[in-house]
Regions:
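Intrinsically disordered, low-complexity acidic/polar segments
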Residues: 21, 52, 96-98, 123-125, ...
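Surface-exposed amphipathic alpha-helical segments
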Residues: 18, 113-157
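Short, compositionally biased strand/turn segments
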Residues: 1-3, 114-115
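Short beta-strand segments
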Residues: 12, 41, 98-100, 112
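Secretory pathway targeting signatures of secreted, lumenal, and periplasmic proteins
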Residues: 2-61
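Glycine-rich, often proline-containing surface loops adjacent to acidic residues and nearby aromatics
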Residues: 39-41, 84, 109-113
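Signature of long, low-cysteine stretches enriched in small and polar/charged residues
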Residues: 60-108, 153-157
Length: 157
């Protein structure tokens, strides 16, 4: 991976032949990198800091509305060394099986949602690359950032 995005306090690496798109509003920022085929990786920063579980549930509701055949599998992943609310899903679209991977975590500045997706035929070769993009994602962490679901008082026990 030779291209690097640095801006808005975040950094990630992505392949040179992928195309980067940025959309922003006062409430959120979305950065998406598209492969030459149909796979993509997307990061959305939600500045009103909604609960990560609500964010994942909202995305899952959208997938359920769009696809009639969908399987959802909970996952355990980290973003920027923080545990996330995570899941993977498989869905059928035009006789092809697609997969999407969702990760959400809340920080003191935003809730981050990573979503990457592709057709199974592409993911045989691109899933590792999509995971490397996710693994390269970094932002300045605040000492107040907590893992989801763990109250602050657990730090003193």
């Amino acid at each position: 991976m030779d291209s690097v995005f640095e801006g808005h306090g975040i950094r990630f690496e992505y392949p040179d032949d992928w195309i980067l798109h940025e959309q922003s509003s006062p409430e959120e920022l979305t950065l998406t990198v598209h492969s030459p085929d149909t796979s993509f990786w997307s990061l959305t920063l939600l500045f009103d800091r909604p609960d990560p579980q609500r964010v994942i549930d909202s995305v899952l509701d959208t997938f359920r509305e769009e696809y009639t055949e969908i399987d959802i599998y909970p996952g355990e992943e980290r973003l920027n060394d923080l545990p996330t609310i995570a899941c993977e899903l498989d869905f059928v679209c035009h006789d092809l099986i697609g997969s999407a991977f969702l990760r959400a975590v809340s920080t003191s500045d935003f809730t981050a949602l990573v979503l990457y997706q592709g057709a199974d035929l592409e993911l045989d070769t691109l899933q590792t690359l999509l995971e490397k993009i996710t693994g390269s994602l970094k932002w300045e962490s605040d000492a107040d950032d907590e893992p989801p679901g763990e109250p602050a008082w657990m730090d003193i026990v």
